[in-house]
Amino acid sequence: MSKCLQQLKRQLQHFGIDGCSLADGDIDYFFTVTGIDRGWGCGWRNIQMLISWLQYTNPNWFKRNFSSGNYEINSLQSLLLSAWMKGIDAEGYAQLGDNLHGKWIGATEVYSLFTGLFVNVALVDFDFRSEASASNALFLYVKKHFESSNDTSNVSPCYLQFQGHSIIIIGFCSSLETLVVLDPDRYQSVQKKFVNIADFNHCYMRKKRSLKFSQFQLVHFKQNIFLNDFSSKLEVRSTRISDF
């Protein structure tokens, strides 16, 4: 499904939901497929969504890096291997190895792939004693991120990793205290024509109670979005938010 943000804005208006700060630009929805990548492909599908956002907001960068227009999973696997060969996250390469077919990836691999494409990536680790503290810190960070819009840079979507799954956050809704998300495992829901607000919220909105984890990893693009050189980012470093 293409141009999800435009469609989402219309649906928010239709249901009278206000107070939502969304990513700038637009984004296409990619989903896992049973028998192909369901169970391991969520990270790759989320990368596709982030690339589509860059295609809308930075078309010249997209043309340089994806001149064929192809960013299927096998192409992304080659890009991740290329980033590792450049020396980015040698530890991750040692763990996953050369054959990425059918392999689940996480936030550090997202960091590595985009760094290899000279995109300036922020990686944030949330590590708390309690699930409530972790979700409170996550929601506060995401709220600030999406409310930081200005005239000189685009506010990007976020990649959110938690136990066993990952999703894309495309906004924050203050009136509902929810994350606005695209879940690569919820194709049927996203494709629906919503007739009531409950179904719409179930598909796109995530409250704290639906994210009961004590650890999260978040990836987003920085406001100075491109790098001239990534030699200082070969080792994966994160911002740690914790109560330990």
Curated annotation (Swiss-Prot):
Active site, per annotation: 42 (nucleophile), 165 (proton acceptor), 183
Domain of life: Eukaryota
Pfam family membership, one: Peptidase_C78
Gene Ontology cellular-component annotations: cytoplasm
Principal place of residence: cytoplasm
Site, as annotated: Involved in the stabilization of negative charge on the oxyanion by the formation of the oxyanion hole: 161
E.C. no: 3.4.19.12
Entry's localization field: Cytoplasm
Biological role stated in the UniProt entry: Deubiquitinase with endodeubiquitinase activity that preferentially cleaves 'Lys-48'-linked polyubiquitin chains. Shows only weak activity against 'Lys-63' and 'Lys-11'-linked chains. Has a role in meiosis.
Protein name according to UniProt: Ubiquitin carboxyl-terminal hydrolase mug105
Organism of provenance: Schizosaccharomyces pombe (strain 972 / ATCC 24843) (Fission yeast)
